[in-house]
Amino acid sequence: NNSDPYLHVMHVHSGETHYTSTTNPEKINVYANCARNMGENCIIFTTYHSLHRIVEADIEVNTIYFDEAHNSVQRNFFPATEHFSEVSERCYFYTATPKHSLTVNKPGMNWGDVYGQVICNVPAPDLVDQGYILPPKVVVKQLPLIKGRKVMYAEDSDNLIETIDDNNIDKTLICARSTKQIMGLLSQSDFVMQLQSRGYSWMMITSKTGAIIDGQKVDREKFFDTLNTWGKDPEKKFVVIHHSILSEGINVSGLEAVIFMRNMDYIGISQSIGRVIRLGSTEKTFGLVCIP
């Protein structure tokens, strides 16, 4: 699966992949130690949800990189994080949104014994000034006040279509409140019909439903391959709807705007905005942030 015969690649997570993949600690141990015994290298890609499986595999880890490291402070993930911070030779943490704690019993990235000291911290304005990311542009849409918790799918559809039309957006990330809201929007309103009449495709992905493109269920690899292909196509118009699964970790340069349909914490908002301020075509000069 790779061009280097002396490099062995394994995935440790429950997601779909064509690479060697398992969450079984015994198989992880055998795979890693076979490579080690042959004097060859092994790279393991895992998730925070599956990191404890590598702890259980009891293998030697020389270097570990924690991407989106603010997730590592979560109660379910921190024990494995702390373990590898102690036993690995080199341990690095990367995040645009560090999560600190002022509570003794609640882990935070300011815990020096686990996370060490900050090696590099680059302010976002510097990244904008040096041309690495685009500045965000915030647009606030005034909505009528709805009493109670009743979900109005038709109103959601109207608000989204108006926002897309008013701002002339071709490639949009929509952050919904829940999977239920997404399914209601797609099945109990004219949202899909309105998109199709304007020449848009649509995509959705949640942990409950999996990935869907224009009504067809697909695997995750197909979803992300399509997302990247459409993002690079200047003629393609689409919306991608999610609850939380796309808030971080994706790099699609073509996404022009994010529309929030729910309240999010600081990290969730920052990470979602980060999806649309990536460099794109020369015509893309900012990432649009639409807030109801």
PLM-predicted stretches and their roles:
Residues 179-206:
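Conserved helicase motor "Helicase C" RecA-like lobe of SF1/SF2 P-loop NTPases
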Residues 29-81, 242-244:
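Conserved RecA-like ASCE ATPase "motif II neighborhood" in helicase/translocase motors
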Residues 44-47, 89-96, 239-242:
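Structural recognition of the conserved hydrophobic beta-strand(s) that form the central parallel beta-sheet
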Residues 71, 207-292:
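Conserved RecA-like P-loop NTPase helicase motor core
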Residues 1, 12, 170-178, 205:
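Conserved RecA-like ASCE P-loop NTPase motor core of nucleic-acid helicases/translocases
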Residues 1-26:
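Conserved helix-turn-beta segment of the N-terminal RecA-like "Helicase ATP-binding" lobe
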Residues 116-189:
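Conserved interdomain linker/interface between the two RecA-like ATPase lobes of SF2 helicase motors
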Residues 71-133:
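Post-DEXD/H (motif II) to motif III coupling segment of the RecA-like Helicase ATP-binding lobe
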